[in-house]
């Protein structure tokens, strides 16, 4: 009745812990690559599943999810319980939980802008008129007014423009006008693969500051 995620995160933690115990048990007989594939398939996939719903959860909830990822990194790399984990996460090239959530929201926003699908998300975002921005050289979204309800400010409708407009200009470059009759009217210049690659590079510095 409080629309909290404590019970869901507790259940997720139990499920991941079960797989982590098995991974630690077999880790001495598996090489790093195999252990990494198992970890990604069985545990990291659970952390990423519908993780956009975790957007802007209280820090204590995000920290519980981060503990799972930290333990997963230790299991893969055979680190001890109290070894400093940040260098390990960096070496694995993993975004931390908060940045993984932002990555999901921004990638959904990209898809909605580029393809117009899914329609139920595309209808929630509005391109800002170039005349009302400092520069018309990149794609900016209109930001809705903040609500007094905290749960409303966790919605895609509110947070997608906030996260999108915080991206550097090179990720928001508009596509050049189409000169053919292909019927494709892309909004953004970068292809999906290039956008996601550069987005991860951008978010990585927030997960692992230099």
PLM regions with names:
Residues 1-210:
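Hydrophobic/basic alpha-helical segments
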């Amino acid at each position: 009745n409080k629309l909290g995620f404590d019970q869901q995160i507790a259940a997720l933690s139990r499920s991941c812990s079960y797989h982590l115990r098995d991974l630690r048990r077999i880790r001495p007989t598996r090489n790093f690559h195999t252990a990494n594939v198992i970890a990604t398939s069985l545990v990291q996939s659970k952390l990423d599943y519908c993780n956009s719903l975790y957007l802007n959860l209280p820090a204590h909830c995000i920290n519980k999810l981060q503990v799972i990822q930290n333990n997963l990194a230790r299991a893969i790399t055979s680190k001890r319980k109290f070894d400093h984990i940040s260098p390990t996460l960096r070496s694995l090239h993993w975004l931390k939980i908060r940045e993984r959530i932002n990555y999901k929201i921004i990638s959904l926003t990209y898809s909605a802008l580029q393809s117009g699908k899914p329609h139920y998300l595309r209808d929630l975002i509005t391109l800002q008129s170039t005349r009302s921005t400092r520069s018309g050289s990149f794609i900016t979204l209109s930001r809705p007014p903040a609500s007094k309800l905290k749960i409303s400010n966790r919605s895609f409708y509110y947070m997608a423009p906030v996260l999108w407009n915080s991206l550097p200009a090179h990720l928001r470059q508009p596509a050049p006008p189409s000169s053919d009759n292909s019927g494709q009217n892309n909004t953004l210049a970068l292809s999906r693969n290039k956008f996601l690659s550069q987005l991860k590079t951008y978010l990585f510095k927030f997960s692992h500051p230099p």
